[in-house]
């Protein structure tokens, strides 16, 4: 994985209806990013087209829609992921532990700029 600014598009699995989009800044095995409601930081390792890591996500802004049911519901959530990368794109799969429930997801990252 090249250092840079990446867009991320996440689709939840396990029958959970949820998705999110945001940005991540990856640099030398660490990353930081977020979207309008959540921020995340984590670490990763990579080699020969594969990468894996761990991310901790927190909510920074509550939803204004009272009918919205955020998957993470204001909790700090730890997620493990692994995936592949080639050129400026990556596909990852992971699992988040939300309380006592595990929620899977897949995400696509696209490199936007150097940092």
Where are these regions (language model features)?
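Tryptophan-anchored aromatic micro-motifs
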Residues: 1-16, 92
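Short hydrophobic/aromatic-rich beta-strand segments that constitute the beta-sheet cores
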Residues: 8, 31-34, 51-55, 90-95
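Short, solvent-exposed aromatic-acidic interface loops
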Residues: 12, 34-39, 56-60, 96-102
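Residue-level signal for secondary-structure boundary sites
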Residues: 14-16, 52, 61-63, 102, ...
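Edge beta-strand at a domain terminus
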Residues: 21, 45-48, 91-115
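Short, flexible N-terminal segments of the mature chain
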Residues: 21-32
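Broad, structure-driven detector of short, well-ordered beta-strand segments within folded domains
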Residues: 24-26, 42, 83, 109
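Contiguous, well-ordered beta-strand patches that form the walls/edges
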Residues: 36-87
